[in-house]
Amino acid sequence: MNYFNVAKIVNTRGLRGELKVISYTDFPEERFKSGAELQIFKTEKDEVPVQTVTVKNAKEYKGSFIVTLEGMNSINDVEKFKGMILKVEEDQLQDLEEGEFYLHQIIGLDVIENDQKIGTIKEVLSYGPNDVWVVKRPNQNDLLLPYLKDVILNVDLEQGAVQVSVPEGLD
């Protein structure tokens, strides 16, 4: 079964079992709604969840979320989860509009410029206002491409390719 990151549990809050989480999802209103089921993993790379939990309630708070889980009413119930990752199963992913995609769908796609394959997407970095796509190139250093409409021209998931225009100086 495939799981996808939703948030990182960064701390507890108060004594009543609240968790402070940093959201990784574009759909926090869906992921943290009352009754939503989430899986807790020790690390992002783990393949088996530590526990499956149900959201009791959540609220946005200073750029993060305060989440309470069903059946966990004290700090003693949740303290063990600090530093762990919240994930959802693949079948819980939202349907996207045409032309939209999940980042995990582009990892491994061929990168094409002027009908020539220049590499494959290795990872996506999300540090600033734009994501940066890391392109693994044969016998060269990785290429860092900002996710801008003038650089990333087309993403074709069916063909497994991304059309790009590499600006001068980035090569």
Swiss-Prot record:
Disulfide bonds: none
Pfam family, one: PRC_RimM
GO cellular component, one term: cytoplasm
Protein localization: Cytoplasm
InterPro entries: PRC_barrel-like_sf, PRC_RimM, RimM, RimM_N, RimM_N_sf, Transl_B-barrel_sf
One Gene Ontology biological process: rRNA processing
Functional note: An accessory protein needed during the final step in the assembly of 30S ribosomal subunit, possibly for assembly of the head region. Essential for efficient processing of 16S rRNA. May be needed both before and after RbfA during the maturation of 16S rRNA. It has affinity for free ribosomal 30S subunits but not for 70S ribosomes.
Entry note about domains: The PRC barrel domain binds ribosomal protein uS19.
Family stated for the protein in its record: Belongs to the RimM family.
NCBIfam families reported for this sequence: 16S_RimM
Protein known as: Ribosome maturation factor RimM
Species per Swiss-Prot/TrEMBL record: Pediococcus pentosaceus (strain ATCC 25745 / CCUG 21536 / LMG 10740 / 183-1w)
